[in-house]
Amino acid sequence: MPAASDKPVVTRFAPSPTGYLHIGGGRTALFNWLYARGRKGTFLLRIEDTDRERSTPEATDAILRGLTWLGLDWDGEVVSQFARKDRHAEVAREMLERGAAYKCFSTQEEIEAFRESARAEGRSTLFRSPWRDADPTSHPDAPFVIRMKAPRSGETVIEDEVQGTVRFQNETLDDMVVLRSDGTPTYMLAVVVDDHDMGVTHVIRGDDHLNNAARQTMVYEAMGWEVPVWAHIPLIHGPDGKKLSKRHGALGVEEYQAMGYPAAGMRNYLARLGWSHGDDEFFTSEQAMDWFDLGGIGRSPARLDFKKLESVCGQHIAVMEDAELMREIAAYLAAARKPALTDLQAARLEKGLYALKDRAKTFPELLEKARFALESRPIVADDAAAKALDPVSRGILRELTPMLQAASWSKQDLEAILTAFASEKGMGFGKLAAPLRTALAGRTVTPSVYDMMLVIGRDETIARLEDAAAA
């Protein structure tokens, strides 16, 4: 049988549906997706919903929405772990038949009494079942669990692509339960059975699962199954180096969508959280697929840096095709529960993207810069901009308006008219631009007056200048 690393790559993302898709889970899914896609492999999605009390359909939907927004498409149908419980139980019984597991009739009370006694005597509290080597003829007619018969000497070695060689002394591991007394499988069994049956070749997951790898390796070996390639990635910490929590800001992937970050920028930034390709900070998803490898993942926790996130997202907005950018803005408005753009607003915005998209790090920032194109008359100036409209400035606007009405409405013609007018009046262009910004946008900081005029058109420009002159 070929080694897992020599077979076509199959990765998987296996979240528990107990809440939203955490940003750490989003990065784990991304790493699995990049590794599979870059090797023309398969990326699978499994929902680990065996905890029926905590698992909810709403959480599953939230996970799927988060992955879809990130652009992480999976292959085949979504697998439900709970739906495979009969298969898990079948494997537990096969382990019994192989002598790799045994029935344990010890009650919870007996196990707790053992541990209390061990603590009192200063002994290890690791439970050693008296039923491990018991003659089956001595088995009582009573409820039992099935425990894996773990080796009690030697060591289990994990060759991890990120963590390196990790050794576990077998004497420190107990005979874990694989099937409960009610016939339901434990997570530790279910995950191995599912990964084997789904043909997973590479298990890429958080390093909080590293200890599980030793026990799961024992299950693989007990069943004579090939052990996958392990890659346990470090967790994400906050900017202060502490475990990521709500006090650090948004935790859910969908929150980032609602805050207006572009999905391509999020993929880029999350890929750089813990993985590197030289000094490259900005790259496309296609480049990431080509470059991504497990050897580039560091062992230390990555720190979330919102300034870097915004910088990367700004670069992605700047290079987006206009049609794609308009689609993403529409999706952002829907996710943030904000009113959709009218046809007129959308037309003006798309017309002005050339002057806006290299100035914004998020969609809200872009839309704020585009307010001049989205607002309807009369334009209400803020306090700072209103100061530029004194009687002299209003007179200038009244005098300028007829000249603009006759313009060809090209940037070159508008620039020539405004420059000549300012020169004729003996004023610097900045002094002319100030009342124009107020009239057109009601703000002191705007795109260039030429860009604003071109975006909103001749009629709207003249109407806004006339409104301001008459105010």
From Swiss-Prot:
CDD domains: GluRS_core. One of its GO terms (molecular function) is glutamate-tRNA ligase activity. It is found in: Cytoplasm. Its EC number is 6.1.1.17. The keyword Acyltransferase does not apply. GO terms for cellular component: cytosol. A motif ('HIGH' region) lies at residues 15-25. NCBIfam families: gltX_bact (TIGR00464). Catalyzes the attachment of glutamate to tRNA(Glu) in a two-step reaction: glutamate is first activated by ATP to form Glu-AMP and then transferred to the acceptor end of tRNA(Glu). This is Glutamate--tRNA ligase 1. It comes from Cereibacter sphaeroides (strain ATCC 17023 / DSM 158 / JCM 6121 / CCUG 31486 / LMG 2827 / NBRC 12203 / NCIMB 8253 / ATH 2.4.1.). The gene is gltX1.
